[in-house]
Curated annotation (Swiss-Prot):
Binds 1 Mg(2+) ion per subunit. This ion appears to have a structural role and is required for catalytic activity. This is Putative lipid kinase SERP0390. The keyword Kinase applies. Its EC number is 2.7.1.-. It comes from Staphylococcus epidermidis (strain ATCC 35984 / DSM 28319 / BCRC 17069 / CCUG 31568 / BM 3577 / RP62A). May catalyze the ATP-dependent phosphorylation of lipids other than diacylglycerol (DAG).
Amino acid sequence: MKQPYNHGVLFYHEHSGLKDIHNGIGEVAKSLSSMCKHLSLQLSENKGDIIKYCKSIKNENYSSDVDVLFILGGDGTLNELVNGVMQYQLNLPIGVIPGGTFNDFTKTLQLHPNFKTASEQLLTSHAESYDVLKVNDLYVLNFVGLGLIVQNAENVQDGSKDIFGKFSYIGSTVKTLLNPVKFDFSLTVDGETKEGNTSMMLIANGPNIGGGQIPLTDLSPQDGRANTFVFNDQTLNILNDILKKRDSMNWNEITQGIDHISGKHITLSTNPSMKVDIDGEINLETPIEIQVLPKAIQLLTATEQNN
């Protein structure tokens, strides 16, 4: 088999979701070394290291022949690599290997949740271009959330058990918290403004959030648009609505309690100021401005999911 890439770099954290990271790296390297003439294993010891390595790759201080990047980790680790690639305009394909608490975007890439199987799938993968959300000065691949989403993310980051289960970020969050904290908001999408009061808001680029899939059949991270969902009340009807698949043309007609707005440019302010979760990382507070960057990043995508 001809190796399609010259030099690949595999980034990983010692504290990823894998029980034995060193054996895991060995298994992954078997597949990736078949794709690259030279494979470098790069440990990220501290948050921000991956972004620094991206700068070094851009300046060719790391090496002058790097032509593919790999990441072993969850959505937060992937988010760091996405920010490094976007900040330093690295026009390099990225292969994603699941290894964290949540691996939502690997589902979008049709990759298996098992790291070994996913790395084998990369052997027959192809690069596709995906949209990126620019949120203030940060970059986001999958979602932006506030309200109940942040509370759940903080529970996970604190190391406590995920009390909301697989569908944590959407369905069970609404069902479980009986007295959520509400906030006033002013949301402008492509020049149209909506104001109101809510306890949860989600802006999605990808269709998979918190282990579950948003039941919007035409939601795509390759269409140049972001999808905003505003949760208006906390009745159990919302949970039922969430589980019913529909397309964007009839969402607002048949869905009670969740408004859907699609667009390319979003501004959001709240009272009081709210923490913002971006791909599982709580790095911002409102107000925020979101711009969709169409097909801004290349990700290796499997031809079909290997179940």
